[in-house]
Swiss-Prot record:
Signal peptide positions (record): none
Cofactor binding remark: Binds 2 divalent metal cations per subunit. Has a high-affinity and a low affinity metal-binding site. The true nature of the physiological cofactor is under debate. The enzyme is active with cobalt, zinc, manganese or divalent iron ions. Most likely, methionine aminopeptidases function as mononuclear Fe(2+)-metalloproteases under physiological conditions, and the catalytically relevant metal-binding site has been assigned to the histidine-containing high-affinity site.
Stretches for region Disordered: 1-90
Name of the featured protein: Methionine aminopeptidase 2-2
Keywords (A to Z) from UniProt: Aminopeptidase, Cytoplasm, Hydrolase, Metal-binding, Protease
GO CC list: cytoplasm
Sequence ranges of Acidic residues compositional bias: 35-45
Catalytic reaction list: Release of N-terminal amino acids, preferentially methionine, from peptides and arylamides
Statement: the UniProt record of this protein carries the keyword Magnesium: no
Length: 439
C-alpha cells in the first residue's frame, strides 16, 4: 500500500498503543472439509446362519481417515492451515546480506535471536502464503470485461476464506484477514483506489491496473502488489518497475541507508523507456511515493524508503519489516490526491472529541471493534450491514479521528505501474516474505 513522501500521509503515524490488548486467538481456526466420511455402520447378515444356528456377522470395514486437502481449490477456499497441517508455513526467499557485519553477533547468537521470533515468523509466513495463492489465482483469472467490484470481492473473499476468518463477527477481522483494502488503480491512477458501492467501472483491454492488497495474521501484515496489462506495448513499463523493486530489495539490509536505496531504485528505473503510439516515454519514478516500514496493525510505520536518491541517512535495522515498493510512470512522475475517497483509517493520535452526532459515535464503535488501526473501505462497512453512515463518517474525518485517503494520480493520459514485496530484516538473513514463483 503506497506511502506518500514527504510523509504527510497520516498512516505513517499509526502505532499500536497497547500491544498487550492485541487479540490473540489462534488465526488458524475454521474448518473446510472436502472428503465425505466413507465409513459404514455394522451390518448383520440374517440370511446366512453359521453352524450351530449363530448368525454370521460381516467384518467391520476399517474407518477411512479424513485427509487434508493437498491442493488449493479454484477459486481459493481451502484453509492455508489445512494445506499445512503441521502449521509450518513456507519460508520466503532468504537472501544473504551484501556486506554482513560479523562483529554484531556470532552466527549462533543470530540463529538464537531468529528462533525467539518463531511465532512472529510463522504468522508472517501464514499471511504470505495466503497472499501468494490469492494473487496467483487473481492473475490467472482477471480479464478485460470484468467489473472492478467483482475483482475486488473475488480477492477479498479468497483471502478471508484462506485464513479462516470472515470478519463478520465483532473482532474477527482483527485476528486475521485483509491487511488493507484491495487497490485496483488504473492507468494514471497510481494508488488508493478501490470501488465503492455502486461502482460500474469495467476493466478494459488497454488498461494498466495495479493490484495492491494486504493479508494479516495476528496483526502481521504482508503488503505486496503487482501490475497487470493486456497490451504488450506496456511490457517495458512493467519490466522497469519490477526490476527497480528487485534492485531495492537486493540493496536492503542491516545498517543500509534509506537514501542510498532510493538512488539504486532510481538508476534502474530510469534506464528503461516505453513506446506508446509512436512516442517514446522515459520511465520516471513517482518521486513522492515511497516504500515504508510495517508495524503490528500499522501498515505505514515510521520509516520511508524513497524511490529516488535522497539525503536520508536513516538506516535499516535488525528486526525491521519493510514494504519495498516502486512506482513508475510515463507522466510527470508526481502524484496528487484526486477523486472519490474509498480508503480510510482510524488515527491512533486522534483527539478525544465529545461527538454530538449519534451516527458518528456508533460508527466509531464499529471501527474500533472491527478494524482498529487497520485501513478499511466503505465496502467493508456495507458488508457489516452499516447503512446511511456517510454523515457520521464525514464527521469523524472532520474531527480528526479518521483519516481519509483519496486516490493518488499522475497526469491524465499517462500510465503507471507498481511492484511491491514485504521483507523481514532478520538477524541472519533478509527474508523476502511475499516472494513467489510469479514475481
Amino acid at each position: 500500500m503506497a506511502a506518500q513522501a514527504p510523509p504527510t500521509d497520516e498512516l505513517s503515524k499509526l502505532s499500536v498503543e497497547d500491544a498487550d490488548n492485541k487479540p490473540q486467538p489462534d488465526a488458524s481456526n475454521g474448518n473446510l472439509n472436502h472428503d465425505e466420511d466413507d465409513s459404514e455402520d455394522d451390518a448383520e447378515d440374517a440370511s446366512a446362519p453359521a453352524a450351530g444356528g449363530a448368525k454370521k456377522k460381516k467384518k467391520r470395514k476399517p474407518r477411512k481417515k479424513k485427509k487434508n486437502p493437498t491442493q488449493q481449490s479454484d477459486p481459493p477456499r481451502v484453509l492455508i492451515s489445512q494445506l499445512f497441517p503441521d502449521k509450518q508455513y513456507p519460508k520466503g526467499e532468504e537472501v544473504e546480506y551484501l556486506n554482513e557485519n560479523s562483529y554484531r553477533t556470532t552466527n549462533e547468537e543470530k540463529r538464537h535471536l531468529d528462533n525467539l521470533k518463531s511465532e512472529f515468523l510463522n504468522d508472517y509466513r501464514h499471511a504470505a502464503e495466503a497472499h501468494r495463492q490469492v494473487r496467483q489465482w487473481a492473475a490467472k483469472n482477471i480479464k478485460p470485461g470484468q467489473s472492478l467490484t467483482d475483482i475486488a470481492n473475488g480477492i477479498e473473499d479468497s483471502v478471508r476464506a484462506l485464513v479462516g476468518h470472515q470478519g463478520l463477527e465483532e473482532g474477527d477481522a482483527l485476528i486475521a484477514g485483509m491487511g488493507f483494502p484491495t487497490g485496483l488503480s488504473i492507468n494514471h491512477c497510481a494508488a488508493h483506489y478501490t470501488p465503492n458501492a455502486g461502482n460500474k467501472m469495467i476493466l478494459q483491454q488497454d488498461d494498466v491496473m495495479k493490484i495492491d492488497f494486504g493479508v494479516q495474521v495476528n496483526g502481521n501484515i504482508v503488503d505486496s502488489a503487482f501490475t497487470m496489462a493486456f497490451n504488450p506495448r506496456y511490457d517495458p513499463l512493467l519490466e522497469a518497475v519490477k526490476a527497480a523493486t528487485n534492485a531495492g530489495i537486493k540493496e536492503a539490509g542491516i545498517d543500509v541507508r534509506l537514501g542510498e536505496i532510493g538512488g539504486v531504485i532510481q538508476e534502474v528505473m530510469e534506464s528503461y523507456e516505453v513506446e506508446i503510439d509512436g512516442t517514446t516515454y522515459p520511465v520516471k519514478p513517482i518521486r513522492n511515493l515511497n516504500g515504508h516500514t510495517i508495524l503490528p496493525y500499522n501498515i505505514h510505520g515510521g520509516k520511508s524508503v524513497p524511490i529516488v536518491k535522497s539525503n536520508d541517512t536513516t538506516k535499516m535495522e535488525e528486526g525491521d519489516v519493510f514494504a519495498i515498493e516502486t512506482f513508475g510512470s510515463t507522466g510527470g512522475g508526481h502524484v496528487i490526491e484526486d477523486g472519490e475517497v474509498s480508503h480510510y483509517a482510524k488515527r491512533t493520535d486522534a483527539p478525544k472529541v465529545d461527538l454530538r452526532l449519534s451516527s458518528a459515535k456508533s460508527l466509531l464503535s464499529v471501527i474500533n471493534k472491527n478494524f482498529g488501526t487497520l485501513p478499511w473501505c466503505r465496502r467493508y462497512l456495507d458488508r457489516l450491514g452499516q447503512e446511511k453512515y456517510l454523515l457520521g463518517l464525514n464527521n469523524l474525518v472532520s474531527n480528526g479521528i479518521v483519516e481519509a485517503y483519496p486516490p493518488l494520480v499522475d497526469k491524465k493520459g499517462s500510465y503507471t505501474a507498481q511492484f511491491e514485496h514485504t521483507i523481514l530484516i532478520r538477524p541472519t538473513v533478509k527474508e523476502v516474505i511475499s516472494r513467489g514463483d510469479d514475481f
